[in-house]
Every structure is written in structure tokens, then in C-alpha cells.
């Protein structure tokens, strides 16, 4: 399985045999992409049974696991792995200064996620990572997800009412430093965010220009996550301009099925659901949203509020107004805790529409 790149099967096989060197080797190769599809409890069980000296032989896997723990909102476990990593580096007098810098720099990169959606705060750690590292990050790959499953960049990074222009400027300034240490992971995010902001302000020509720039920047670079964020903006723009996106949902779905990545299909389904809810075609909404089965899908924690917002829009389109009103208090509390100002505004508008 490992040699064929079938990393989920390899992880289960090595874990079942308690070959934790094998588990950690595959974790490093996968860089957390398919690992995210496993239940966090399973991964934590492996770590509990793995001897410390085995774990310390795999510092790159420890970095991947730190990021995975953030994705799963297992912050104490993330911090514990950080301490183990730094101790493992200090315990290796034979390690070159260059490799120490690479590992410590990549640790700073991963720790930046604890400042998630504080653009300037994250960038301070990205710059620290860049100053220490002589190679791109190993624990973050260009082909991996960037938005934690969210179809929107702006919903992730609009943190405070009245600061949108500052946030856009910060993205323009800060993203190049992140690209430098990740080999261009998430490329185009600042253009997508600017396009989304222009769309919400009714500046449709500016939105179209930013969208075209984002599509051009990510063309042929293998970052499907960012292309799907472009698609999300394109479908919303089509409601105002009448211009059809480059592919319809069925074409896009067939294309994604060939990649065997459930995360990409989940993002496409969310855009499909949101678009058809907005135009009132509830029978065309993907079943997982139409039948309200989101609990059956393993969404990463930072992307979950966007899925809840879209499910709210589906409830609204279905006339299930009591559901929208009843869910609002809990959703708004989550948005407040995560500093999701734009998601909160959408939920408030949906709740008002249901009253």
C-alpha cells in the first residue's frame, strides 16, 4: 500500500500491526492530506501506544501531526507534540544546524495556525519560519487543502467589521511570505478574497477581474482547493451577471471524481447546495445538504461554520424557518469564538429572513 501511495490503507495496516515506524513514515509522506479523513481518536490511539523514542525518530511526522491536531481542534495534543519535537531536536547533537533551523522554522509555521484568521499575527510566524528555513515546508504540500474545507476565503479571514480594506491589504502583504515557505501552497488566496469582497460590495467588474486573475494564477498548479474557491465565487457572480461559470456542476463533479479526494467533492457539494438554495431549486441541492446529513461528513473544525451557514440557507429555501431561528444562537456563538464576522452576518440575515 505504501509503495502505491495508498496511504489510508497503509496507515490502517501498520497501525493494526503496531508498526509505528511504518505509521509515522506514511504520515510524513501523506503530509496530512488523507490523514484528515481518519477519526482523530484512531490517530491518538496510535500515538498513545507509540514509544517516545520511536516518535522522536520521525520529526517531520511530528510536524504533520501537530497540524492535524489543530485541524481536529485537539490543541493540548498539538502543544504536547511541539514540546516533544523541540526536545527531540535538542537531544540530537549530531543534527546539522541547517536541519535544526528547518525543523524549528517549520514548527513556527505550524504554530501560526493558533493565530488563525489573524492575518498579521500569522504572518509574523511565517516570516520567522522563512528566516530559519533553507527549504520549503515538508508538512504542508501544494496539493493539500488550504481552506479547511471552506468554499470561501473571505468567510475565513474577514475578522472584524469595518476592517475589510485593512484585511485585504494584509493578505496582499503577507501571503508572499507564506508562499515562500510552502512552495506556493494556497496560491491565489488574496485574489479570491479581493474578488469576493468586490462581489459583496456590488463591484461586479472588479470581482470578475479578480476572479480571472485568480484562475490564471492557479492554472495547472494542482491546487484544486483554490480552484473550487474560484468556482464558488463564479457561481455567485453568475446570479448577477448572467455569465455561466466555466463548467456546470455535473461536469465539475465528474472531473473531481477522477481525483479520489472526498474533501474536494465536499467543497463542490457545498457550493452546489448554496447556489441552488439561493435560486430556490431545492430538489437540485445535493442530498447531503437537502436531507441535512452533514453529521455523516468529516469536516475540519475551521471549515464547519461555513457548512452550517450553507445548511441554514437550505433550511431557509425549504421553508423550515423554525430550524433557522432555533440554530442561530449556537451558530453565532461559534462565529464569535472563531472571529468569523462575515459568517455571523450571514447567519443574522438568514435568521431575520426566517422571522
Set out the residue ranges of the language-model regions.
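Extended alpha-helical scaffolding segments used for macromolecular assembly and cargo binding
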Residues: 1-68, 77, 81, 355
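Residue-level detector of the short coil/turn that links helix A to helix B
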Residues: 5, 18, 38, 73, ...
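Residue position in alpha-helical solenoids
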Residues: 7, 13, 33, 46-49, ...
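Alpha-solenoid helical repeat architecture
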Residues: 8, 19-21, 58, 95-105, ...
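Single-residue signature of alpha-solenoid repeat helices
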Residues: 10, 43, 78, 122, ...
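Internal alpha-solenoid helical repeat scaffolds
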Residues: 54-229
